[in-house]
């Protein structure tokens, strides 16, 4: 007994023509017995990091390049290594086996069979076998050889040597003596190699005929050739004899790619077929045997009997056999996955251990045992009553048959073989097939047909000679007999005329194609023409005498070489190389409306790809240019020699160019491969559909199949490869009276196998066909359809960086590229952190321990622990699902590196009855919650930065999916869809206006707003005559009002005008409602609907006018009617939208909050629907909303109000308003009793998203001017104090664009069908259907980009809710609390503790979102810890983020989230930033003064729309410093010149800003006495208000320029700095000191002071006071620092310290709110659009002026 492992060899074939055309790279390398598989070239970082796979085998055959003689392994080498060893074992009496494994086209058949010039393993083995027999045979030793040849296809065994053909399938039985065997398999005796060759040739012909008749793919069948060698040994002396019997099995397995390839949605179920069962089971058997050999499972069950193949090969796998395996692989990169699968398969197989024994003298023993069994069975049969006689009888017949076969003499076997060979020859001759074994190498003088087959082993194997009159058909009387789908009993005739002309005449209803063109009349044939009969009988005609050289010359003269079709191409060569694929492609291209759908698809995709490529390359070039510019700026001449700088720039430039080139090459490569794949798939799909339709029509199944297009599920994920084709063919199966099912190509392939079997049984009238039919189910249409993919929801995981919970309703994108509902998910980080160093540079290659954390153990050694992160995924519910797929919905996803998919099942409570309402079908609840622990690596960080968690949502079709499509429920769904569509492009924002007046305490306090029923503006402001006023404008987003990603960045300008007086009794009140933009939206919407209606009318008319309507036409008509009805509903929605429908212009269906107007005006941004980009620069006079004028606004004059300050916590601006500039009698006098004053406040805001643009918002306000409140009014005010309102507002609905789906003429499903059908006609705009569909499908990229943006903004909102430090207004759904803030802070300062006084600085727009993405304590050695920061007069000049040290690398998709100001640095500044000094040296002071003179030259900011008016500029006495904003170069100069921290700036308003120093507050001494607290003033400008007591001199307009002096240090928390006054101080020397501040002031809890809170005036905390003493000025500001100094625990407002609330308490506390202000009498700038009169003529009539609601 010999225990040996299975020998495994691997052979790599040369590149084929297709791979050479695609320029694919070779990824396989062989050295000795090692095979190295390199990862294919990829444009992702993960691809670059993949290591090569190394495998070791017994033999590695390099057959790539024949010219490399030292390395090349030919057929002879393969035979010597494998064949000779097998042959030797066979002669020793061992069983032996060789099986070839690999994907289709990898060279299995070539290795096993070869061809005439290069014989393969089997012919060489047989030849060597008989050569050795000839040498060794003598008197004492004789040899007998028998062969059998069978095919296993779809779990059925067919005898290829059977003369009756291989139609009948044989049964596999297992005998306890013989083991598994095939009952009835021919075992023929042979005496020479020629006999074997003849039998194999005839067997292959039978196989070809059967495969062609049934249209089976021979590459999907297994062929087993058995050679049984019997050695008889004679002892001449004693006369005894003994036998050795060995069986050699040569197995050519089916193509393995069916198993290794997985479908788009994970491993697709192989439905309805056993085609892959054998290979799958073989893999399981090999794995089980490998585990047994490794000692893992000695008793592990080996599933031999699960498939016919493994059952028959039981002895060869792990049993009594010497087995070798040859694995054939492709070297091409595009076959990487299949190659890897094959190598892994072979790697496991080499571990199998077989136990071979010599089979000595088995016959005598077998015969004896069989005879004993026969006697026992006869006895049982006569005696047994309990057992059923038929079973025993069958067993008895089986054993007797075996005995008979074993006792047949050798001579009888030879006679039987001869008789079978003659019968087969007669049968082949009757079919018209030549018996020549040499294939098509026949006489030169004969005309013949040769078959074309996809399998190279069967191609051109059958030769049919033509007579003068040849009849072709299925009837036995025909000269050439063909059987199969579409072949008529009498199909066609071929005639050869006397002059040599050959013609083909098809019969009626007999499908005949010549060169792909369907022919109905007599057609002349030429040499090389391709003929198709029926569905799948392809032939090529060979006419040796008629090569038509003369005719070709004439043809070439007449036809341009550039423009000839396939027909001409076929005639261009006398010896054309036309294979099966060419003929098949030719038929498909010419059958479908004589058009090439594949070419259309390819052309459209190529055109769009080139456009994308050009755009992307341009963007790439600009990006690299920006990088180079930054490098040039960083390389200062002082630091580096000029030569090194230029070298570095040259190198950078070269590297940038290389990157662009490499990126373009990789993208081109991927695109070429994708196009080739799409072409193959479309050809294949059309072929399969044609055959399925033939079968269904023949068998009257009332089922129709057609090709449609869909997006592969893998391409709906954000993790997909970029540049891949985003569409794939799919099959629509439709049965009359039933719904439509969508099948994959693989599914139809598998179904077709059962269809063919059923068809064959139906043709042969097999009585058990019905029984088999019932058992298998109907392969034409599924009664119980399996689950369908509803769509894929992409959850971007950036929130794991930020440690915030992402709660979001993720859109589910369907395979037609539409949103098919929303999945409500929650993703959060439970434990673990993102490491700082890795976060800073997750691509650093020099850190070997990047995925671990350094920890010092007890012994002092540094050990590395793996960093872990736990994140939780919760799936709550799916809403808005399509009603047809809302049965049994479940979710499936794979998180990061998890091996298995996670399935989330829906919540089903059997006790609760399902609700009957229609809406219930739209929502499915889940209770899925799962935690994942992952190791933090660079790859994982890259995944959460760039990738997404793709959750697939699956569902089953509802039972009533065949109901009429325009039912009421369907219309409800349409309305819901309409709401969802508009929800994606709309967002609401509120504009609140309040007016502040100077009160008796010197504070600006909000005036009251009296509300009344007849007031439409929200209320009437009660203004006191002659008081100084300010206007405060606040812009807020409205939560849950739409999913448009809207970001209001800042208020740019505030203007006021259009003063109108109205009678309360005689005239209607005015408000802020206008319909300019709403009318524009409705007009655009109506235009789109009119286009669709015209198109639908035309299509319906076209279909209706058809005299004979096909099934397709009727369904098309039904779909058109459905769309027409839906269009009517949509048109109604345009004109009369239902209240609360979410459609712009819908009647207000809400109760507005106090002060809010009821009606909601619309503003239309008119952005590009694809990517929400603006077609032009929407700034200044082109800003959105400029022309959205209100009634009575025509020709009115507006005045620009200087902005005093911006708010830190929201987008809010306070502007000074001097009402006298209007020169209006109505504003200067007390308002009469029955009169009301109306004004319009116009606010220009900066949007950063959805596009960088300016937006003009208008709010009409009503005012009443009084002199003094009467006693009654005063009493009323006190009684109703609680309900007093101080601000009024209006809600705007912002519409970015018309929903894209509205403009689509066909629904996506129909468009996909029309595109796949490749209809010639175009749509109204000249585009073809395929172009429309492809453009629509390519929008998935945009959907994902916008979704990335929406989720990123949601994360930022979550951050702002968690800690109020983001100073911008963010607006997206799913977050309840929004922190709106001002983006123009000037810098960032830190105190001794190493944490910032500012909550956060977002002025550093050049840095990425990472600056605010994480929290963490700033390291003590941070370069930003020094007190002397880098000041900047430019708010955006900072280039280093304060959070750089502990935030992750910016995700690539966060670039668009940066404020647009960084991109528009050349725009006029919003405001200037003067500097606060700390303890300056004289030199620094001089530098400062020099810079300040420079800055004086710049002008204050004026919006572009006011450029035509005189600039408002206050005249300031003795003012040397004019606040302004310098450009970027001044910023850099200033950073270099001065080294200190900046603070809030004064604004270019002509007013002074009250600023206190925030420099080292914790270092200042505080006296312990009750004397006044002191705080230094270092600002260059201080605005002083008049305190109660002795008045100050009126020229208090300048602050001291003296350097700060520190008074001393104390132990208390509150510190002061005293500043000595100059001689020309604003305070007179005799000014007495005000009263001390109460002691409570010094005991206030500490907190972080925001820069803007240092402004004097109505501050937020209300603890700001000023005291003036002789000789010095002190300003006190009490800071509030958290007791716990950990920056990570700072919670801001969410901790309950609501600082805003403290401001209200400060009224009536004069000692705490002393303000020194001196308002100069400034005039505003009159503002009026230059073209206002031209665009909008003045309307006098009240009725015209009032907007219609």
Curated annotation (Swiss-Prot):
InterPro entries: FHA_dom, Kinesin-like, Kinesin-like_KIF1-typ, Kinesin_assoc, Kinesin_motor_CS, Kinesin_motor_dom, Kinesin_motor_dom_sf, P-loop_NTPase. It comes from the Eukaryota. Residues 1421-1430, 1719-1741 have a biased composition (Basic and acidic residues). The modification Phosphoserine is found at residues 636, 1274, 1441, 1477, 1481, 1524, 1600, 1650. Residues 633-652, 834-853, 1370-1402, 1417-1436, 1584-1665, 1698-1749 are annotated as: Disordered. SMART domains: KISc. GO terms for biological process: cell division; endosome to lysosome transport; Golgi to plasma membrane protein transport; intracellular protein transport; melanosome organization; plus-end-directed vesicle transport along microtubule; regulation of cytokinesis; vesicle cargo loading. Keywords: ATP-binding, Cell cycle, Cell division, Coiled coil, Cytoplasm, Cytoskeleton, Endosome, Golgi apparatus, Membrane, Microtubule, Motor protein, Nucleotide-binding, Phosphoprotein, Protein transport, Transport. Residues 359-431, 552-775, 1086-1126, 1475-1499 form a coiled coil. GO terms for cellular component: centrosome; endosome membrane; Golgi membrane; microtubule; midbody; trans-Golgi network membrane. ATP binds at residues 102-109. Residues 469-519 form the FHA domain. One of its GO terms (molecular function) is microtubule motor activity. Residues 5-352 form the Kinesin motor domain. Residues 1370-1383 have a biased composition (Polar residues). Plus end-directed microtubule-dependent motor protein involved in intracellular transport and regulating various processes such as mannose-6-phosphate receptor (M6PR) transport to the plasma membrane, endosomal sorting during melanosome biogenesis and cytokinesis. During melanosome maturation, required for delivering melanogenic enzymes from recycling endosomes to nascent melanosomes by creating peripheral recycling endosomal subdomains in melanocytes. Interacts with AP1G1 and AP1G2. Interacts with ZFYVE26. Interacts with AP2B1. Belongs to the TRAFAC class myosin-kinesin ATPase superfamily. Kinesin family. This is Kinesin-like protein KIF13A. It comes from Mus musculus (Mouse). The gene is Kif13a.
